[in-house]
């Protein structure tokens, strides 16, 4: 699996010989393994952004890693619950640290030029995220087909890129949704789209705590 690959890649990584007061792994997986195995620091913290079990991680893979961290931060109560279930011995060292967003800056950027360039006058549905299996876009495409078949006047827009673009576009073409479900690619400023849409949808198979939902 990709989780095992990250483990193997970290095992072969270069050791950082400098000594640090503190080292922080910003993400589960490779970053956490690397900080644990190859960084020399007095204190080590790590962050967990996904449901530990649903994301495919296992105690068998990580049992010699997480218990060695002084602090483990999760982005939500549910992520903490899932992690502590796998590592009850880490419960006292695990804390919830919610994602931080700059609301003032988001509102400022939402007022900048940009956003939808068509003249569509129906309901606009928006999703923002990478085009990966985790985000379950194929289900969203099927949902758009149902809306269209029921005569609902709506158009679904997706901001983001990823390895599934070709596969998703093929599904869109097969269902005749070329004008109804649009893959717009990644945008440097997505916030005008948030402001202009009628409904934001975040369909995903698993999630820690979605920053996109917080931003919306």
Show where each model-derived region lies.
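Carbohydrate-associated surface elements
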Residues: 78, 100
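Short alpha-helical segment that forms part of, or immediately flanks, the ligand-binding pocket
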Residues: 191, 210-215
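A short, histidine- and acid-enriched strand-loop-helix "catalytic/donor-clamping" loop
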Residues: 31-33, 41-58, 71
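A conserved mid-protein helix/loop that constitutes part of the nucleotide-sugar donor-binding site
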Residues: 123-146, 152, 163-169, 211
């Amino acid at each position: 699996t990709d989780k095992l690959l990250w483990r193997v890649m970290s095992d072969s990584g270069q050791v950082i010989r400098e000594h640090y007061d503190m080292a922080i792994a910003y993400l589960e997986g490779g970053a956490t393994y690397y900080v644990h195995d190859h960084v020399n620091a007095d204190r080590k913290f790590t962050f967990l952004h996904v449901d530990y079990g649903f994301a495919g991680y296992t105690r068998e893979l990580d049992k010699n890693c997480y218990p060695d961290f002084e602090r483990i931060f999760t982005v939500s109560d549910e992520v903490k619950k899932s992690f502590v279930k796998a590592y009850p011995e880490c419960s006292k060292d695990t804390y919830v640290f919610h994602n931080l967003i700059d609301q003032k800056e988001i509102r400022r950027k939402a007022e900048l030029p940009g956003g939808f360039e068509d003249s569509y006058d129906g309901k606009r549905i928006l999703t923002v995220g990478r085009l990966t299996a985790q985000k379950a876009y194929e289900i969203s495409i099927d949902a758009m087909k149902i809306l269209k078949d029921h005569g609902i006047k709506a158009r679904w827009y997706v901001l983001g890129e990823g390895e599934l673009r070709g596969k998703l576009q093929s599904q869109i073409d097969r269902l005749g949704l070329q004008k109804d479900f649009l893959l717009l690619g990644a945008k440097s400023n997505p916030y005008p789209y948030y402001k202009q849409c009628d409904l934001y949808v975040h369909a995903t198979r698993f999630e820690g705590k979605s920053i996109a939902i917080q931003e919306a």
